[in-house]
Amino acid sequence: MKSKIIRAFTISWSMDFVTGMLPDLQKKYEVVLLSSPGPELDDAETQYGVRGVRIPMERQISLFHDVVSLLRLIITFIKERPAMVHSMTPKAGLLCMVAAWLTRVPVRVHTFTGLVFPTATGLKRRILMFTDAITCACATHVIPEGEGVMADLRNYGITKKPMKVLGYGNIKGVDMMHFSRRPEVMELAQKLKKEGMFTFLFVGRVVGDKGINELCKAMEKLSGFAPVRLLLIGPYEDDLDPISQESKEIIENNMAIEYVGGKYGDELLAYYAAADCFVFPSYREGFPNTVMEAGAMGLPSIVTDINGSREIIVEGENGVIIPSRDENALFKAMLEMVRNKKNREYMAGKARGMIASRFEQNFVQKCLLDFYDEILKKHV
């Protein structure tokens, strides 16, 4: 009889991190996916034959809804009797680890893909640190996505438990066959290129924490120095972390900035292939997948000196690292990327190989499967 594993996420969108490895997981374990209702959970059930459990969870602090979600999780874990609950994302981590501890689930794993509290202030920061500490206390195993996240958990006193980074970090890995300059991708990319125009690309949520305010100001200044354009790909999240009104006006009025919206599949790859440099001035990350994807597509990157980004990018080898929240440093790095063709081409030439050697998807997934085998043998 196969051991039952429940993989838990706050929202179904986050399941993208695990669906690619479901076939291998299902060979060894009975896998149940748990999240708030959403189309990604529906798709996983249809495509992979996996069973889904739908429990609404709020991403923001909401005491009443959180208590209701916790009670539903307790009932679910009593009914399912899993050998392991493995949670990702902050709210699912807190609620699932508490519920799994209360119901005596033998193996309770939480993966920290990023930490919110280091960039928070005041009471909110104290609350976030407290909830992360509870998550760790209730878990039997704490998995930081990268060395930087692990260092923060230790240095801020969130937990004293032994922690382990799997492989070189990251939870998903990069499908190097998919993220490649295939003929059909390059055909689409050719239509997106503009002759004589240097193209910067950002892929991610268009929110304050991603450094969009600094990026807009840097780009507004840069457009007066060189023929450049910035393509912004990703959704706005005005209800959670809106960009400034000034930035919205810059995006609307500056002809050098083009908001593209959401792009997926080969269409997204075409934008990577049409760009000259990836720029990602985020304030905080766990291990940003888009920086790895850009590298796999042969792009040099400009990133900030934060967790994850500085583990993917090696200064001067496959990109440039600058201080976060510094629009002047961002402007100078972008201008240097435009002007110094020799350095840019050197970094572009190294980018794909440096991703493949550390973050190839099969390797990353094997690290997680080996970890599951190890801990379930010991505890079940």
Predicted segments with their positions:
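A conserved mid-protein helix/loop that constitutes part of the nucleotide-sugar donor-binding site
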Residues: M15-G20, F198, F202-K221, N328-A329
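Aromatic "clamp/platform" in nucleotide-sugar-dependent glycosyltransferases that forms part
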Residues: Y264, Y283
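Donor nucleotide-sugar binding/catalytic pocket of nucleotide-sugar-dependent glycosyltransferases
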Residues: V53, A133, A137-V185
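A short, well-ordered alpha-helix in the C-terminal region of glycosyltransferases
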Residues: A329, E336, N343-R358, V364-D370
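Short, structured helix-loop element that forms part of the nucleotide-activated donor/catalytic region
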Residues: D42-E45, R229-A256, V260, N343
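Short hydrophobic beta-strand element within catalytic cores of glycosyltransferases
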Residues: V291, P300-V303
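Conserved acidic donor-binding segment of nucleotide-sugar-dependent glycosyltransferases
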Residues: E315-G316, V320-E327, E336-K342
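Short alpha-helical donor nucleotide-sugar binding micro-motif in glycosyltransferases
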Residues: F77, G262-K263, A270-A275
